[in-house]
């Protein structure tokens, strides 16, 4: 089977690395970004399109990686009339349960096949081609998108019909956010009890309570390394998606409610564009 032609819409924190890995795998690639200057650095590996319509015209796979469901929907509306009946829309933005249902309906209206496939991982895994893809959608389109998924990820988990991927992504993000906030609180408690907060990381290192993520985010908190791998503003957006999904399922997530409040406090203090580990600054 020949390599698919790919249109990647959204070349921000995640999209740039994904684009480079798709191109490195030999797939013809066109890229577009709402802020055009964010796409221009990819001119060495892809065709930088001046419009969504130009990017998607003739593409076999259209990949969306933008901020939220409204951004995704607005972007794909600009593709209307340029999408072929065999086009597969590989939707990888985090949009939540209702968002995925909304986009599935839009895909039907646009006349394209829809695969809901958010990812686990942030900027570095995206650059390294090491994302975990949570894919959901019709089985018959899988061979057509496998080259793309193999290029951007180290593993693809197929989890059912379209929408299942977004539901699993929320559960995974709930765990990530809880861990980040837990690290921040443990460091703050160590500090305010009169100890060097680095002692917390030393105490758990290498034991059953440790994990690479604990050391990574904990060290970032102590060193002030807040360059955004996952910006607080995006984490707050996703926390709202998690709580909305839980409410729809009749589930009370008390811990996540508290995490969301701390993220909001950090965003209100001006840290929204910093990494979510900057929640530590407001403890």
What do these predicted ranges mean?
Residues 53-112:
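Rossmann-fold NAD(P) dinucleotide-binding segment
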Residues 1-64, 123:
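NAD(P)+-binding Rossmann beta1-loop-alpha1 motif at the extreme N-terminus of oxidoreductases
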Residues 129-136, 157, 161-193, 202-216, ...:
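Active-site-proximal catalytic alpha-helix in oxidoreductases
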Residues 75, 94-173:
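Rossmann-fold dinucleotide-binding core
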Residues 29, 48, 113-115, 156, ...:
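Hydrophobic beta-strand scaffold residues
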Residues 166, 175, 210-277, 282-283:
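Interdomain hinge/lid region at the active-site interface
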